Every structure is written in structure tokens, then in C-alpha cells.
Amino acid sequence: MLRFGLCCIFLKEPIKFRRTTAKYLQAFSRNQQLENLSAICRHNAEALQKALRYCRDNKIKDFRINSQILPLKTHPAIGYRIKELSAHEQIIRTFKHGGKFCRDHDVRTTLHPDQFIVLSSPHSEVFQRSVADLIYQAEVAQWVNADVINIHGGGA
């Protein structure tokens, strides 16, 4: 069955996913960084719920989740484990609620990690960071009941 879907961002709907930068967060203590990231991740989990409801209400059967739904998750200096975030239980619960919603309403979710995920890289550091990012994407996929993670398979 052919499913038309939405990709990550809404132009006209008041559904916004938040991001941040490592440069911005580096000005703060580690605790402040984690609190900021916790608020952003909680917001993004809630925004995903709105996006999924929008898809259901408009008979859109697929939604591609932005690869930065948990911003900077695997960043070498700012990265974090989800359990380090003060709102981690609420964040995970909200994502899992989204997964149940998708099952109940036949809305498919997919993920598409960024183009810098290069498993074929001859550089060990690039390969290791790619694997870490895919593990993070797989964790999110499990929470939201996503059955596909598209990856780039190009040469190095």
C-alpha cells in the first residue's frame, strides 16, 4: 500500500520542534546543559504527539521523525544518556504513548538519520559516531513503534 506522509517540519501548523547548538550549551554548567536539553526533549516529545494527531486527523499515514528529536544526543562534548535528563521518564512515556497512538490509528513513523551517518567511512571515528547515532535512532524507533530507519549507504 502506498502511504503519503509528512517529513519532519510543519510550515503552517503551530507544531514546532525545538533545537539547540553545542556552542550555545557550552556556555552553561553540565547541570544547566542537561536541564535545557531535558526541556527541549520534553517539548519535542509533546510536539510529536501533536504531529501524529495532525496526521491522523488529515488522513496522512506516515510521519518522518526529525533526526534531532533529541538534540545533540550523541555529540562528543554535549551528548547525554536519556536517563541523565530530569524529565526522562516523562519523555520516554510520551514517546511510547505516541507509539501506541500510531498502532491504534495506523500512522506509520520512520526515521532518517542525517547524511553524516556514514557506515562505510574508512575513518574509525566517523564509523563509531555513526554507530552511536544509529543506536540512538533505534532507541527512539522502539519507543514510537517506527519500523524503518533509512540510512545513507554511499561510499567514503
Which role fits each region the language model picked out?
Residues 131-156:
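Eukaryote-skewed repeat-based solenoidal scaffolds used as protein-protein interaction platforms
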Residues 1-107, 117-120, 125-128, 139-144:
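Alpha/beta catalytic barrel-like cores
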